[in-house]
């Protein structure tokens, strides 16, 4: 048993472990492993924090995007309503303008009719006066007849014009 290699390997292993324990190699290895574990834990915490921050930024982006979409929809709806109001106002103004123009045209037509009627009456009165004057001159003679004709014609003209 003392000559077997396994025995001497085991003895060398235990001697090496004893020396390593005496020198403090186990505490150095433990400190190294603990430091590495702390670094990994810190990196995991940092990754978790960054992930939460990214999630918050994403949520904020989604919220802002939704608000912007709502605002854009409100702006479009407002513009659409304003355009409809402007179109209605334009139609109303056009209708008012056409009504005023129609009324003005009707007024001008009525004035033209009244003027034409007055001119026809005046022409008819003038013609009647001339015909009456001609008839009276042919039938009546003398100064008295001329004075009577002038007075009568003046009276006829006055009555026809009024």
From Swiss-Prot:
Described purpose of this protein according to its UniProt entry: F(1)F(0) ATP synthase produces ATP from ADP in the presence of a proton or sodium gradient. F-type ATPases consist of two structural domains, F(1) containing the extramembraneous catalytic core and F(0) containing the membrane proton channel, linked together by a central stalk and a peripheral stalk. During catalysis, ATP synthesis in the catalytic domain of F(1) is coupled via a rotary mechanism of the central stalk subunits to proton translocation.
Keyword Phosphoprotein annotated: no
Localization per Swiss-Prot or TrEMBL: Cell inner membrane
Name recorded for this polypeptide: ATP synthase subunit 1
The entry's keywords: ATP synthesis, Cell inner membrane, Cell membrane, CF(0), Hydrogen ion transport, Ion transport, Membrane, Transmembrane, Transmembrane helix, Transport
Protein family per UniProt: Belongs to the ATPase B chain family.
Name of encoding gene: atpF1
InterPro entries named in the record: ATP_synth_b/b'su_bac/chlpt, ATP_synthase_B_chain
One cellular component (GO) term of this entry: plasma membrane
Source organism of this protein record: Methylobacterium radiotolerans (strain ATCC 27329 / DSM 1819 / JCM 2831 / NBRC 15690 / NCIMB 10815 / 0-1)
Keyword GTP-binding: no
Subunit structure and binding partners: F-type ATPases have 2 components, F(1) - the catalytic core - and F(0) - the membrane proton channel. F(1) has five subunits: alpha(3), beta(3), gamma(1), delta(1), epsilon(1). F(0) has three main subunits: a(1), b(2) and c(10-14). The alpha and beta chains form an alternating ring which encloses part of the gamma chain. F(1) is attached to F(0) by a central stalk formed by the gamma and epsilon chains, while a peripheral stalk is formed by the delta and b chains.
HAMAP family registered for this protein in UniProt: ATP_synth_b_bprime
TM segment ranges: 1-21
Coiled-coil residue spans: none
GO MF annotations in UniProt: proton-transporting ATP synthase activity, rotational mechanism; proton-transporting ATPase activity, rotational mechanism
Membrane topology: Single-pass membrane protein
């Amino acid at each position: 048993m003392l000559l077997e290699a396994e025995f001497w390997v085991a003895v060398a292993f235990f001697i090496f472990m004893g020396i390593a324990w005496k020198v403090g190699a186990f505490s150095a290895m433990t400190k190294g492993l603990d430091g590495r574990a702390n670094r990994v834990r810190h990196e995991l915490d940092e990754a978790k924090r960054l992930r939460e921050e990214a999630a918050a930024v994403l949520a904020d982006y989604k919220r802002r995007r939704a608000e912007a979409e709502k605002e854009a929809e409100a702006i479009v709806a407002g513009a659409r309503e304003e355009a409809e109001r402007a179109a209605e106002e334009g139609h109303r103004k056009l209708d008012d303008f056409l009504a005023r123009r129609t009324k003005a045209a009707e007024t001008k037509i009525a004035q033209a009719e009244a003027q034409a009627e007055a001119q026809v009456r005046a022409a008819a009165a003038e013609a009647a006066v001339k015909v009456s004057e001609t008839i009276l001159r042919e039938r009546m003679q003398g100064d008295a007849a001329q004075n009577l004709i002038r007075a009568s014609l003046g009276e006829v003209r006055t009555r026809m014009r009024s």
